């Protein structure tokens, strides 16, 4: 029987309280740590989703399967191919936050409400994505941005897959009381 990730994620989200705490996600990658601050004020559903997935260990061991220099680095497919997800989708929360270097946004198909677990981190300003994809966070500090930019400099094959595997070794939620 397949895992019911939606139920696992919902259970992991039960103790989240954006009024009492500030949450960040830390990806410990093969090239260093990326800490992401979240925007629950404009995309609470997306923030809850990444926090729940992180808490159940979904991102642990997942590879960056698509990297386009000067554009973005994509991660979050459990198969490592760009075709998989958590087994459910979430509704879009388009907002006025801009896609710029360090921005955290959700990948999706042509259906605006098809995002699940795949996310991308922008390597540069990408205005054509504004209000077309949900921005829900950004790199929390310059060190995290530098690790992300380093991921963006690796060689890739013709399908934009890194020739040298870059993966999230582990991911965790960081909680700071307000």
Where are these regions (language model features)?
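Cyclophilin-like peptidyl-prolyl cis-trans isomerases
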Residues: 1-178
């Amino acid at each position: 029987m397949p895992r019911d990730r939606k139920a696992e994620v919902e259970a992991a989200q039960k103790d989240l309280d954006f009024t009492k705490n500030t949450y960040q996600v830390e990806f410990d990658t093969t090239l260093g740590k990326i800490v992401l601050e979240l925007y629950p004020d404009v995309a609470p559903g997306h923030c809850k989703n990444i926090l729940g997935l992180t808490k159940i260990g979904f991102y642990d061991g997942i590879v960056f399967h698509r990297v386009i220099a000067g554009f973005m680095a994509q991660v979050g497919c459990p198969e490592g191919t760009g075709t998989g997800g958590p087994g459910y989708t979430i509704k879009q929360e388009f907002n006025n936050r801009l896609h710029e270097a360090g921005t955290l946004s959700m990948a999706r198909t042509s259906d605006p409400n098809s995002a699940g677990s795949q996310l991308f981190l922008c390597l540069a300003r990408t205005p054509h994505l504004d209000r077309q994809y949900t921005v829900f966070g950004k790199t929390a500090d310059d060190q995290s941005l530098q690790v992300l930019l380093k991921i963006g400099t690796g060689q890739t094959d013709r399908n934009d897959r890194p020739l040298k595997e870059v993966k999230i070794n582990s991911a965790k939620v960081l909680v700071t009381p307000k």
